UniProtKB/Swiss-Prot annotation:
Name listed for the protein in its UniProt record: Adrenodoxin, mitochondrial
Positions carrying Phosphoserine: S67, S181
One record GO biological process: cellular response to forskolin
Cofactor requirements of the protein: [2Fe-2S] cluster
Organism lineage string: Eukaryota, Metazoa, Chordata, Craniata, Vertebrata
Gene coding for it: Fdx1
Summary of the function given for this chain in its UniProt record: Essential for the synthesis of various steroid hormones, participates in the reduction of mitochondrial cytochrome P450 for steroidogenesis. Transfers electrons from adrenodoxin reductase to CYP11A1, a cytochrome P450 that catalyzes cholesterol side-chain cleavage. Does not form a ternary complex with adrenodoxin reductase and CYP11A1 but shuttles between the two enzymes to transfer electrons.
Species assigned in the record: Mus musculus
């Protein structure tokens, strides 16, 4: 089976970064559809690797964005305020929050490594039913989240599609960071 574009580069990049344990090198594959295994050998329109906190590695050149490549996303924060921004098709909702510097305290504390549930979001019914299937790892983290609903997902695991244009996602009033057992309530 042929390797995905950039897979060889990904393996080399992860191997060349000094850190303890290869388990800290993760691969986020967006836009591949439900049931896709996350692996450097999976063909994907977008590959992004990370080697530990604060060590992003680009393994493929991102296409230049045009206004057609972006959609509008509305985040309803803990105070009920709606934050409206644009996000690139294929980016995760965590990427959107970070790249647009949205004021959502504590959101994505683990930087998308599935080690916390601080990017917990609640989706509208018509959007939730179109999302890719949830993985066991994401489900395990969601079990630890405050305010869990039947429409809850982690923002680091949901990638934008055109069908999500103008969606509204709600940030729960309280968040649990399982790494520190910290409650960041509405006051944050």
């Amino acid at each position: 089976m042929a390797a995905a574009p950039g897979a060889r580069l990904l393996r080399a990049a992860c191997a060349s970064v000094p850190f303890r344990g290869l388990d800290r090198c993760r691969l986020l594959v967006c836009g591949t559809g439900a049931g896709t295994a996350i692996s450097p050998w999976t063909p994907s329109p977008r590959l992004h690797a990370e080697a530990g906190p604060g060590r992003p590695l680009s393994v493929s050149a991102r296409a230049r964005s045009s206004s057609e490549d972006k959609i509008t996303v509305h985040f309803k924060n803990r105070d009920g305020e709606t934050l409206t921004t644009k996000g690139k098709i294929g980016d995760s909702l965590l990427d959107v929050v970070i790249e647009n510097n949205l004021d959502i305290d504590g959101f994505g504390a683990c930087e998308g490594t599935l080690a916390c549930s601080t990017c917990h979001l609640i989706f509208e019914d018509h959007i939730y039913e179109k999302l890719d299937a949830i993985t066991d790892e994401e489900n395990d983290m969601l079990d630890l989240a405050f305010g869990l609903t039947d429409r809850s997902r982690l923002g680091c695991q949901v990638c934008l599609t055109k069908a999500m244009d103008n969606m509204t996602v709600r940030v729960p009033e309280a968040v649990a960071d399982v790494r520190q057992s910290v409650d960041m309530s509405k006051n944050s």
